[in-house]
Amino acid sequence: IPRDQIWVTSKMWLQDYKYEDAKKAIETSLNKLGLDYIDLYLLHQPYGAVDEAWKAVEEAQKAGKLRSIGISNMTPKLWNKFVPNFDVTPAVNQVEFNPYFQQKELREILAKDDVRLEAWAPLGQGNADLLHEPAITAIAEKYGKNAGQVILRFENQEEIVVFPKSVHEARIKSNLDIF
């Protein structure tokens, strides 16, 4: 598979947020992956030396090592604390998102900065209540889909970046068949 047809996301862990450690962490990620660049690189949590880590990812992006840079788990309060001090606005904020947890306040803030919300747990971490929600199952039955497909379609229509995970081939195919 050609490299330009594969999207690679990696994260920097909290213990690497000091500036010099952050620079090393980026290089370590590139080396372990055997890549010249990473498509999206995220800070895993908005705690600790966020400003130092962000400076390192901004520099790595300028150097062409990181195509896009973002943050994970940043609440509205933390977004407003950190992002105004960044030179480069994050392209992505990866947070929990599903029909039970729609992050409306955060989405409004991100929209103002033209930032994409990327959902982890887009299917509610397998929450049986969500997958058996009567409104969702009724829509699924009406359109000949399963509850997971309805949820992923909803999130796609809301312009949420989703990446449901599965090791089951049938489920992976089902997750792609949402249109």
Regions found by a protein language model. Name each.
Residues 1-6, 123:
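N-terminal binding-site loop/beta-alpha segment at the start of enzyme catalytic domains
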Residues 2, 34-37, 65, 89:
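Short loop/turn motifs at secondary-structure junctions
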Residues 7-20, 42-45:
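Structural motif corresponding to the early beta-alpha repeats
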Residues 17-33, 52, 77-80, 101-103:
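Short, acidic/polar
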Residues 22-42, 59-63:
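CE4/NodB-like, metal-dependent polysaccharide N-deacetylase domain
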Residues 45-179:
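Beta/alpha (TIM)-barrel catalytic core signal, keyed to glycine-rich beta->alpha loops juxtaposed to Asp/Glu
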